[in-house]
């Protein structure tokens, strides 16, 4: 693009960079309306992991509601990956491998690699078992497609017409697009991402968000509770394992840190995969499928040797702390005081240690059941009488306010004592949740 055209475009476009965490808040509405969203931002900032994680959460909640609970989900063999297609535009062949098909007004061409995913969507929508359910097509690296393919995909979204002439029900299909910015976009002039210009059709046929790199949004999203299917049951847990959240809250510089001695890096993608591994270990132990424990070799496999060793050391340290059940007791009484040796240990902990322990306590299966009012009282007392970092208030505030139905943290939110207790700092939780981006980092 010439300098003159770029200057004219700058005058026409006023780009506001949003934090990815802010966009996550509005995703349920787009999931409901099936309006396309397009998220543009630099690579490595967590777009794909955050969007896909939230997408899986929305799908799981919808299936639980439509099918009537986890018993039916298990009976019907629920697998969230059967409910969406993930298409990586960067993996599309560079040569013109295309298939012509008839659209309303013209003959379009579509990459051959896309056809199986579109057929998968059609089969899903035709299956009576899936009546009332949404199918999602997530196209990552959308700007890796040339402009001709971008137009073709937009025509598909607009018309719902598949290459074989059949149509898909647009009211039951939701498109998510994510891509890297072209240098012609104001605010991204220095971008060196390999990308094509974004078609105007993409911008006008959906809500286009431009996002800025923001590790704090990634950590905040990671601390939010969602419902996840283990293959056996639904559990409420963090989007990112509390081990990693606490370690990264303590050492944010480890996130996306380049190591000249190792090609591996701890970014949003590897953090999510490492989190899945850590939860997988917990699931196997809970299902009594062996005496499993996390291994530092796996952490290094995702994050690299140097950063992996630092993470493993922090996780090992967190493992040595008092457990949530030691801090909260057996739930038979609400007695708790500063004279209690366990409470003294908690009070002496660093901020990131308290962060881990309280987040872990609100997960399903932690041994601290917040449908029991004695546990609720103790949490309220801890938040009101002990030294708790502001990050914990912010993370718990978001966690409580956005808790899915049927989870441990939702039990906490619904508890009348928690909402009324003067010690709970309930209003403070809400206030900090709304102002979460202003909280200080844990020293």
Q: What would you call each of these model-derived segments?
A:
Residues 6:
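Cationic, low-complexity basic patches in intrinsically disordered or flexible, solvent-exposed regions
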Residues 9-86, 90-137, 142-443:
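C-terminal regulatory/interaction module of P-loop NTP-utilizing enzymes
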């Amino acid at each position: 693009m010439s300098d003159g055209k770029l200057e004219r475009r700058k005058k026409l476009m006023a780009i506001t960079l949003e934090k990815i965490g802010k966009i996550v808040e509005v995703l349920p509405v787009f999931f409901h309306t099936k309006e396309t969203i397009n998220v543009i931002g630099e690579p490595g900032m967590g777009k794909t992991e955050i969007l896909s994680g939230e997408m899986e959460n929305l799908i799981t909640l919808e299936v639980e509601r439509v099918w009537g609970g986890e018993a039916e989900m298990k009976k019907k063999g629920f697998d969230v990956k059967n409910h969406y297609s993930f298409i990586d535009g960067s993996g599309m062949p560079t040569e013109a491998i295309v298939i012509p098909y008839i659209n309303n007004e013209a003959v379009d061409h579509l990459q051959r690699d896309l056809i199986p995913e579109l057929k998968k969507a059609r089969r899903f929508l035709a299956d009576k078992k899936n009546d009332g359910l949404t199918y999602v097509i997530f196209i990552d690296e959308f700007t890796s497609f040339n402009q001709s393919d971008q137009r073709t995909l937009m025509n598909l979204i607009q018309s719902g017409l598949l290459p074989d002439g059949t149509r898909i029900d647009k009211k039951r299909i939701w498109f998510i697009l994510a891509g890297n910015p072209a240098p012609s976009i104001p605010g991204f002039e220095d971008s060196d991402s390999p990308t094509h210009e974004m078609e105007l059709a993409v911008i006008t046929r959906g809500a286009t968000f431009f996002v800025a790199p923001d590790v704090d949004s990634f950590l905040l999203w990671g601390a939010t509770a969602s419902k996840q299917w283990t293959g056996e049951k639904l559990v409420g847990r963090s989007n990112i394992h509390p081990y990693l959240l606490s370690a990264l809250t303590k050492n944010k510089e480890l996130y996306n840190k380049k190591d000249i001695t190792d090609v591996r890096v701890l970014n949003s993608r590897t953090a999510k995969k490492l989190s899945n591994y850590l939860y997988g270990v917990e699931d196997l132990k809970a299902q009594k499928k062996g005496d499993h424990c996390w291994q530092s070799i796996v952490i290094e496999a995702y994050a690299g040797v140097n950063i992996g060793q630092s993470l493993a050391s922090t996780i090992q340290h967190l493992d040595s702390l008092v457990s949530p059940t030691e801090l909260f007791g057996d739930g038979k009484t609400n007695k708790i005081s500063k004279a209690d040796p366990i409470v003294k240990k908690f009070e002496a902990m660093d901020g990131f240690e308290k962060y881990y322990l309280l987040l872990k306590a609100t997960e399903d299966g932690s041994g601290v059941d917040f449908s029991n009012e004695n546990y609720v009282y103790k949490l309220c007392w801890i938040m009101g009488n002990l030294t708790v970092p502001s990050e914990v208030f912010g993370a718990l505030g978001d966690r409580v306010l956005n808790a899915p139905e049927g989870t441990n943290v939702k039990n906490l939110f619904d508890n009348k004592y928690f909402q009324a207790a003067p010690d709970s700092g309930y209003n403070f939780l809400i206030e900090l949740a709304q102002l979460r981006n202003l909280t200080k980092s844990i020293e």
